[in-house]
Amino acid sequence: MSRTRFFQLLRYFHVVNNQDLPDANSNREKLFKICPVLSALQSSLKTLPPEEYQAVDEQIIPFKGRSSLKQYVRNKPHNWGYKSFMRAGASGTMHDFQIYVGKNTCSDRGLGLSGDIVLALTETLPEKQHFKVFADSLFSSIPLAIALKERGIEFCGTIRIDRMGKCPLKTEVELRKTGCGSCD
């Protein structure tokens, strides 16, 4: 298919009826034009049987156009684009995802945005079946690990020093003085 033909077809492709659009002043979703496609994709992904080992991570969907949802994340292969959070199995199969739309990306559960995203993405996992969820330091916190443990989901992740709460640990300088292989 030629480029011209593709853009002609794309011009008439609409997921939502433009006559039924909510007012620009009303409190509408930022992704309202593609929401039916996203929800259909999410529902089909949730029918896949979950794997025992799951990973939660962020991904940038490359995009160079203009959009209020476009994010910049340094140290990624594609710095500019739409930020999405996803849960994938050990085989690499995606089981659930959410597109970042700001503070209202998911409901507030008191764990901060990153913790709330992990809880939202693991909602569809059956409870008390000892699924193992892995995440990097962006998502990890002690309250999140406790919340997942209450649901019977095991969690593994690196916790940042500023998310340790009132845990009395040695500073990095003190650990360096004690030598290699020492722990707190």
Which residues does each PLM region occupy?
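N-terminal initiation segments
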Residues: M1-E154, T158-R163
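An anionic, glycine-rich sequence signature occurring as long contiguous blocks
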Residues: G165-D184
